[in-house]
Amino acid sequence: MRIWIDADACPKVAKELVCKFALKRKLEVWMVAGQPQVKPPFACVHLVVVESGMDAADDYLVEQAEPGDLAICSDVPLADRLIKKQVAALDPRGREFDARNMGDKLAMRNLMADLRDQGQMGGGQAPYGERDRQAFANALDRLLTRLQREADLRASQPHR
C-alpha cells in the first residue's frame, strides 16, 4: 500500500501528518504536484512534479495509484476517479470519500461552483485549523488500519 498526496492542494500540516504516519507504519508516500514543492527529508517520501497542464497532476495520480492505495485529496472529481479505481480517498479535513457518498459530494461541489460563478457565494473553505488537523489525524489512522487489515487478509487468502 502506498499513500498518494495531491500536493498542490494539501495543507502543509496534513502533509506532515501523513509523513509521520508513513514513517511509523513503514509506508511509501508519493507527493504529486503541478508546482515545485519542498520534499520532506525522509527516504519513504517521493515527490513527482508533473509538467504543467490542466489536471496533469490528477491524471498522473490516477494512472499510478493502485487498488488498495490511499490518496489524500480535496478535489471531488479526482476522488471520484480514484474511488472508481478502488483507491481509498480522504480529504485533508478527515472526510472519507467512498462509492456511497460520491454522488452527493459531486452534486454539492457542482452546486457550490455554480453559486460562486453566479456571484451568489464567496469562494473557498475556512482556514485549516487545529480541529481539521485532529479530524484528519483520527481519520487517517482509522483508514490506514482498515486498509492494512484488508491487505493482510488478501495476502493470506490462497490464490486461485
Swiss-Prot record:
Coiled-coil annotated spans: none
Signal peptide: none
Family: Belongs to the UPF0178 family.
Protein name according to UniProt: UPF0178 protein PLES_56411
Organism: Pseudomonas aeruginosa (strain LESB58)
